[in-house]
């Protein structure tokens, strides 16, 4: 029996949801199409009715992962009186370190995405840019250039800390890494830019509210 358009769209969304999680858990090359489709509860043969290739899926799944991450964090910071402190604290939490499948895709897949094709890298870049713009509106700085620089430094420091904390096989060293970055940021007086208003912070380009609300925030 021919699958309806609605069911086909649901299946496609299911594949993307599963891919965003499994790629982060196992790596892009660590999960094949057959296993991915099995995890989605679908047949291998149906894959190419939704995507041109695995590379096509990778580009869309990685872009979606960044979108979900970005929207979750923006929502969290929008509802916090100390958004940067909240962001750093939750990002550097042990539960984020230990839950790559639901965590930041840049920390989980950054080095792999760098080796992907132009489509994947471009999609990730375009989905990440609004998050840097958002952060640049709430960090301190006398100029837009300085605030953007600090926003990039903040995010890059957090990503790097999680990467190292996951790589090392010494739990105390892992904890020390997370604590060191948290303390360094605290010592820099990480505070919200007093002149910035949440009304000035750009909203994410693509809100996937229903799906993002189901994504476990880490």
Predicted regions and their residues:
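Helical hydrophobic small-molecule/effector-binding pocket
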Residues: 79-107, 114-122
């Amino acid at each position: 029996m021919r699958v309806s358009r609605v069911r086909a769209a649901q299946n496609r969304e299911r594949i993307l949801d599963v891919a965003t999680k499994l790629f982060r858990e196992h790596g892009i090359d660590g999960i094949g199409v057959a296993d991915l489709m099995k995890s989605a509860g679908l047949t291998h043969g149906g894959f190419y009715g939704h995507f041109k290739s695995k590379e096509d899926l990778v580009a869309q799944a990685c872009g979606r992962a960044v979108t979900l991450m970005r929207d979750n964090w923006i929502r969290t910071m929008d509802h916090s009186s100390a958004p940067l402190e909240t962001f750093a604290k939750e990002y550097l939490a042990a539960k984020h370190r230990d839950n790559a499948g639901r965590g930041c895709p840049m920390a989980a897949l950054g080095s792999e995405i760098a080796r992907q094709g132009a489509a994947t890298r471009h999609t990730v870049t375009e989905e990440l840019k609004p998050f840097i713009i958002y952060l640049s509106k709430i960090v301190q700085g006398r100029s837009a250039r300085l605030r953007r620089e600090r926003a990039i430094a903040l995010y890059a420091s957090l990503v790097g800390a999680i990467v190292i904390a996951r790589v090392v096989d010494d739990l105390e060293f892992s904890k020390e890494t997370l604590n060191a970055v948290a303390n360094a940021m605290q010592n820099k007086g990480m505070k919200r830019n007093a002149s910035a208003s949440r009304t000035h912070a750009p909203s994410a380009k693509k809100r996937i509210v229903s799906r993002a609300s189901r994504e476990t925030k880490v």
